[in-house]
Amino acid sequence: MMRLCLVEDSGAANLEPLTLTRATFDLMLGTSTLATKIARAFDIGPGPARRGAVIRTSLAEVQRSRDPHTAVNDRDWLGRGEVVVANGRWVPPADFDASGLFGGSAWVGLCEGRPACAWVGPEYAADLEPNCVDDWFDDLTSKVECSDIGGEWIDRPWDLVAKNSAHIRRDFEQDAKVGLTNRHLSSIALIGPAERLFIHETARIDPYTVFDTTNGPITVSAGA
């Protein structure tokens, strides 16, 4: 069973004030969090046996309350087997293919020359500690094979703003959201391509609401 551990490096400080009360990987980009994008890239689902995190100790209790199914700063969990360790500020490329990356010896994946993720056994994973992630990656890159895997970094708060539009489009395409019910079509005004608009069947839309998809997709989520 594949496992994923999301980690925070010293770059979390450069994302303040957004990261004062949340982990870096809980920041939104497009229509999902950075954590969701990383987990999707590696095709790793939720659950306490599959997800872990190494974050600032000041946020540990808050994170456990928000996400009780993730093992937070849990060295025992880290030492139970092989695991993908991913920097929570890394955004995998849209065409990322994780198949064939696992098994065999440990490796480090680089993005723009910086460690973005790694596949390691328990002998390395158990050494992960809060506030020491940079040193852990530096040590690992000196011992195992490293290769470029692409992607991009979220280094500053304004990166989320600058990249948001492109990721809204990317998320819409990856989610393959299509279709409007006749009920919605009969009550809205649409400007632009209909295939760029997704309205969940449970969403309540006031009559004659105008949706303009000329410049990009629009998603109305469940319960809206």
What are these model-derived regions, one by one?
Residues 1-195:
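Terminal amphipathic alpha-helical/low-complexity segments used for targeting or macromolecular assembly
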Residues 182, 188-189, 197, 202-209, ...:
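A structural motif detector for beta-strand N-caps
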Residues 214-216:
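Active-site-adjacent "gating/activation" loops or surface patches in catalytic cores
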